[in-house]
UniProtKB/Swiss-Prot annotation:
Cofactor: FMN
InterPro entries: Flavodoxin_fold (IPR003680), Flavoprotein-like_sf (IPR029039), FMN-dep_NADH:Q_OxRdtase_AzoR1 (IPR050104), NADH:quinone_OxRdtase_FMN_depd (IPR023048)
Cofactor binding comment, as recorded: Binds 1 FMN per subunit.
SUPFAM superfamilies documented for this protein: Flavoproteins
Molecular function GO labels: electron transfer activity; FMN binding; oxidoreductase activity, acting on NAD(P)H as acceptor; oxidoreductase activity, acting on NAD(P)H, quinone or similar compound as acceptor
Record lineage: Bacteria, Bacillati, Bacillota, Bacilli, Lactobacillales
HAMAP family on file: Azoreductase_type1
Signal peptide residue numbers: none
Function: Quinone reductase that provides resistance to thiol-specific stress caused by electrophilic quinones. Also exhibits azoreductase activity. Catalyzes the reductive cleavage of the azo bond in aromatic azo compounds to the corresponding amines.
One Pfam family, short name: Flavodoxin_2
Name of the protein described by the UniProt record: FMN-dependent NADH:quinone oxidoreductase
Name of the coding gene: azoR
EC number: 1.6.5.-, 1.7.1.17
Summary of subunit composition and partner proteins: Homodimer.
Amino acid sequence: MANLLIVKAHPLDAQKSYALRALEEFQTRYASLHPEDRIEIVDVFEDQIPALDKPLLEAMGAAKRGEAISPEQAEQLGRYNALTQQFLAADKIVVVNPLWNLNVPSQLVSWINTINVAGLTFKYGPEGSIGLVKGKKLLHIQSNGGVYAGQDPAAQYIKSIFEFLGFEDIHQVFIEGQSADPSQSQVIFEEAMAKIDQILESY
């Protein structure tokens, strides 16, 4: 039995988002192939994702020094650490997001901050940082109005972050071009799902 963690980073629903529509179909197909696997979902728009702000940074520093922190800081720090541990416990990760202004939603960045933890997911070496997260798989699904073929900053950001952490098994599927040619929207979606089906054969 494997643990699958889905990170949902879109505030709309599947009727209004090609990315979430693809996620729904992915979940159905994945569950039929791996009925024993455990699936957890983090919705970065609905769940509590602590922002890496001044109170949280101060709480992190105080905790390392063994100093007291406020109940509010303890709650935020506890949630932050829980998200890190949830990520580490997962065998497979699915990240689903739109491309907004050539970037990912800021809420997704906040979640990504929780998985970049020195000493847990990477360490500092004499020649640079070393990723500590090995043997996990990533599937990144992103919807784009235009066609970027993975060269947009958001896609590159996701890929580089997970490579930095040590991931080697990375797949990216882009549902893109619907705004450029709305008449081809269904064809574009079906082509993306065909790619996802192919990935599922070994995912």
